[in-house]
């Protein structure tokens, strides 16, 4: 598999936008209910985590006062730097959930059984360490750039920087869990692979965002159940760009 990845990173690969849309929607239809319920659970965990984090720094006695304290400190250099560091570790801590959401699509595509339990599969070794370290680096670099921009008064560019880093590292998790690369190789190859088809990848993810929003307004279902379409497109991109070996991880083998 490593030879295939090296070849694609070196010579390039083909992506068909129409097929990406068809494939992503096909797996989304199979996984949206489980993924949506999983998103509820993960969102609840993150909310509790952030409440605990804010409470440990600002106290639990008055939540509204805590929010006001954060708003007051938001432009303080020390707070900006501190929040960047916290964001870096939080993104790394929750990254295995991203792997779980992506993997649900693989299980559906390969006609394997899946459940909410599969969202926690990549908190196990050998995957957890590699995913955690990769997103610690991604989060660290992103936090460095966004913190510097904020300190110099260019907060409006932060979103653009975050989008660029997200797209350039889009293949990192699939390369770890399916390509069996370590975190340094996965990061490097992801950037190389993205550079071969940047426009189509950007358009595909933009379509995924639009599809997510249309699902909210047209189908009248909550964003919790439409966000997983982003992971379906994420999976479709890797599946079409790289593909899989028969030994790719299944829920029974983890």
In which residue ranges do the predicted regions lie?
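Selective recognition of hydrophobic, aromatic-rich stretches within alpha-helical transmembrane segments
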Residues: 2-4, 77-112, 143-182, 216-247
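Interfacial aromatic "cap" segments that immediately flank transmembrane helices
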Residues: 14-45, 116-144, 165-216, 254
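Membrane-interface interhelical connector segments
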Residues: 72, 109-122
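Cytosolic juxtamembrane C-terminal amphipathic helix followed by a basic/polar low-complexity tail immediately after
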Residues: 4-6, 12, 16, 244-254
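A general structural signal for short secondary-structure boundary/capping elements
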Residues: 56-57, 238-239, 252-253
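Outer-membrane beta-barrel domain signature
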Residues: 39, 45-58, 63-64, 146-154, ...
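Short, small/hydrophobic-residue-rich motifs at membrane-helix boundaries and re-entrant hairpins
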Residues: 7-22, 26, 30-110, 139
């Amino acid at each position: 598999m490593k030879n295939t990845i090296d070849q694609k990173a070196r010579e390039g690969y083909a992506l068909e936008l129409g097929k990406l849309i068809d494939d992503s929607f096909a797996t989304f239809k199979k996984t949206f209910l489980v993924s949506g319920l999983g998103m509820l659970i993960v969102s609840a965990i993150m909310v509790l985590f952030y409440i605990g984090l804010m409470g440990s720094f600002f106290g639990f006695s008055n939540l509204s006062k805590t929010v006001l304290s954060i708003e007051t400190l938001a432009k303080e250099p020390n707070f900006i730097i501190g929040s960047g560091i916290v964001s870096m570790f939080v993104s790394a801590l929750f990254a295995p959930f991203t792997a779980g959401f992506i993997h649900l699509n693989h299980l559906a595509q390969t006609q394997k059984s899946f459940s909410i339990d599969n969202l926690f599969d990549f908190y196990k070794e050998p995957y957890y360490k590699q995913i955690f370290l990769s997103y610690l680096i991604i989060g660290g670099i992103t936090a460095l750039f966004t913190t510097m921009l904020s300190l110099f008064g260019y907060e409006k560019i932060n979103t653009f920087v975050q989008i660029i880093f997200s797209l350039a590292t889009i293949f990192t998790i699939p390369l770890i869990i399916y390509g069996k690369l370590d975190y340094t190789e996965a990061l490097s190859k992801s950037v190389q692979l993205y550079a071969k088809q940047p426009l189509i990848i950007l358009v595909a993810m933009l379509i995924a965002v639009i599809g997510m929003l249309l699902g909210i307004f047209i189908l009248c279902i909550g964003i919790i159940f439409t966000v997983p379409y982003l992971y379906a497109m994420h999976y479709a991109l890797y599946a079409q760009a790289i593909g899989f070996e028969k030994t790719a991880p299944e829920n029974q083998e983890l």
